[in-house]
Amino acid sequence: MSKEKFERVKPHVNVGTIGHVDHGKTTLTAAICTTLAKVYGGAARDFASIDNAPEERERGITISTSHVEYDTPARHYAHVDCPGHADYVKNMITGAAQMDGGILVVAATDGPMPQTREHILLGRQVGIPYIIVFMNKCDMVDDEELLELVEMEVRELLSEYDFPGDDLPVIQGSALGALNGEEQWEAKIIELAEALDTYIPEPERAIDLPFLMPIEDVFSIQGRGTVVTGRIERGILKVGDEVAIVGIKDTTTTTCTGVEMFRKLLDEGRAGENVGALLRGTKRDEVERGQVLAKPGSITPHTKFESEVYVLSKDEGGRHTPFFKGYRPQFYFRTTDVTGDISLPEGVEMVMPGDNIQMVVELISPIAMDEGLRFAIREGGRTVGAGVVAKIFE
């Protein structure tokens, strides 16, 4: 049996289910796989195989996640589903599963519950750009007005967190009904798939974004000048391009006079490639690890931001004790550690291992950052937390 060839013809989109415990996220995941396999072809997955999610380790954090795939005529989807609430929190904060869009599952029998709100807030903080709502268990509610009421509540809750609650798609269905092959509910799964296709725009590929490369190493090559090396995070670097050196010190600009990979000279380096870039007129001591090379004007250095943070539990190798205000760990961005001060939300005195928390961070030196940038919190080289930049202040 030969392995099936992965056809790169359709656009690839990453999605996932979010929402309160027992509202039917995993059942819906199984229903999407099964219904779309039936209608458009592909592999069906049953509830048990998805629910029995394998443990993964992302930056030392243990996360249970199920990955499934399905196709619509227009696209290929990779979909993540997590068994427990804590797994969602970790997944969203570490960016282990980057989502281009989320499917918020709300049981019509319960309406929005505490984790519904928490997942919406997390989605806002970590930058999930689009949310589609699947109101589940609608076969258990006879009252039309009650369904309308729940839909209204969910829309209002999403608007509260700056999602377009009035305009985003809400599909009323039954995941279990669809799994059991009932046609009226299978039709709702197809409707959900169509909403995914039309409401979530095709994500921009890394190569189409403005150029950025974190600097890992700096060398000076006699007679040629200074070479910085790193893995290009996004965009393309062409010989002759003007580039900015951003972070830690004042931003400067220079010209890239050469790109090399494995000692071979290239015309350009692309997202995902490890390259060395030769910089015109830049001295060895003017650049350092932790800065980035970027398209001028595309990214700016900052010191103060709001973040959403997950603090590793003792079992994950994190701290054994809580920390308090006045805590000054290192924040590891891309390739380097920078010390920072934290301030905790009002009324929060201490943070326990295993908690997730919003905190404002002020770094001692500026780092090139955008909202959505992930970082680790470290003490003497040991990772004790993971976070994401939610909002930049200065």
UniProtKB/Swiss-Prot annotation:
Main location group: cytoplasm
GO cellular component terms given for this protein: cytosol
Region of interest (G4), residue spans: 136-139
Region (G1): 19-26
Subcellular location: Cytoplasm
Name of the top EC class for this enzyme: hydrolase
Signal peptide: none
Functional note: GTP hydrolase that promotes the GTP-dependent binding of aminoacyl-tRNA to the A-site of ribosomes during protein biosynthesis.
Subunit and partners: Monomer.
Record protein name field: Elongation factor Tu 2
Name of the gene: tuf2
